[in-house]
Amino acid sequence: NPSSMWRHSSIKTLAINYAQTATAPDFHMWVQCALHQMKFANLPEPLLFYRIHQGQASKIHDKISESIQYSMELWISHLFPELTPKEVSLLSLILHGKSIKLRTEEFEIAFSAYDKVRSNNETSLFGEDRETMFSILDAHTQFLKKLLYQRTQ
């Protein structure tokens, strides 16, 4: 990511496998760093500027979405180990998907999975601020529930 800086040695020691995330390696790298409890900081000032062109990786939307889905599932499965693989997959889809194509039953499973993990917002596993994380996720899931139930009525 052009606005990120780190010591090469700190990332290299993680031996990250990018095979499943070739088109969104930066997102996968951040998930791996978090899983290894690396420290992050946001700096308010831009450190570099770059030009945008049609050939860059961010223009390949489907492949990027697949890579992000893979990394989201990895992250969610570690954040909430009590979820089944299906719950992890569906929850990650509703949390990151721009265009969500699920059946009503799948939405119900995802919402149920979210309700299950929402009750355990006290224990931070990787230094994440669970209060802030859940406030954002609450708003998002409530919005999706409202849309779904308006559509099905």
Model-flagged regions — what are they?
Residues 1-74, 82-90:
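Conserved nucleotide-sugar donor-binding catalytic segment
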